[in-house]
Amino acid sequence: MVDMTAKPFYLSESDCKWVEDTIAEMTVDEKIGQLFFNMGSSRDEDYLKMTVKDYHIGGIRYNPGTADEIYRQNQILQENSKVPLIIACNTENGGDGACTDGTNIGSQTKIAATGNAEYAYQLGLMSNKEAAAVGCNLSFAPVSDILYNWENPVIGLRTYGNDPKRVAKMAKAYMDGAHENPGFCCAAKHFPGDGLDFRDQHVANSVNTMSCEEWDESFGMVYQTLIDHGLEAIMAGHLMQPAYARHFNPALTDDEMMPATLSPELIQGLLRGKLGFNGMVLTDASHMVGLTCRMKRSDVLPAAIAAGVDMFLFFNEMEEDF
């Protein structure tokens, strides 16, 4: 059971009562809908109203648009949703991750090259001030991966580099800046850590090959730093971490090894248990091959929930998932 009075929520007694009362009044369909972020394919008002009223989504990550377009879209969504929506953006490099006319500040690698965490703080502050102005309340950032392998096709310039201490310092500074915007939250990614493999989880299985000790001193230290300072959400990647999976379940065979999004060993054992994370766990995009190659969709969704995932990116097809 989640302790909503503890970090990172710190809800009051009346806040907790609102949550409990709201859940108690929900239908089963409404509860199912809360599991999903929809990837909004249209800003048509009828489509937006249908999405929240018929499918009861918990969050949305939308297609690019201008500030005026995104503001109006988010206004329609919130006005028609029974439960306030999580509206997410990808402000890794600037406010242009929330709207096309937002400010591009610079990649995380460019920020890290300065050696000055103040720039990462300002990236988090300014990017998400623009995001909040158009109605967003969650950033899928900071990217908290460590670029150990230059052949990695996913993270590249999206990281704060290959030094875990610098990554931790910069990622924390970004989060601190984002938190200066009232009510704004961060989702660090991609747990348990990308940057070692040459494979791309969009099209194949990807593996974090570190030993438990190596992981603790690198990715573990980065995530522990963010968790200790109030990180609200973590995006689980479609990445395997065999050492820690077998630490929590020594009987696991190679065939049974699953990516974090399907692994109770990594979500419940490592992230919840060892690191003490009490916030939200969401999947990376659920149509990536790193997830879909493991089992059919009708099995993936309940397996991820059983592993400890709270929300999915995205619907594959609304009717199918519902």
Where are these regions (language model features)?
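Divalent metal-dependent hydrolysis catalytic cores, especially in the metallo-beta-lactamase
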Residues: 37, 52-62, 137-145, 308-312
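Active-site mouth loops of central-metabolism enzymes
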Residues: 34-44, 108-122, 204-218, 287-295
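Acidic-leg catalytic submotif of subtilisin-like serine proteases
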Residues: 90, 127-139, 183
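N-terminal hydrophobic targeting/anchoring segments and the immediately downstream early-domain regions
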Residues: 1-106
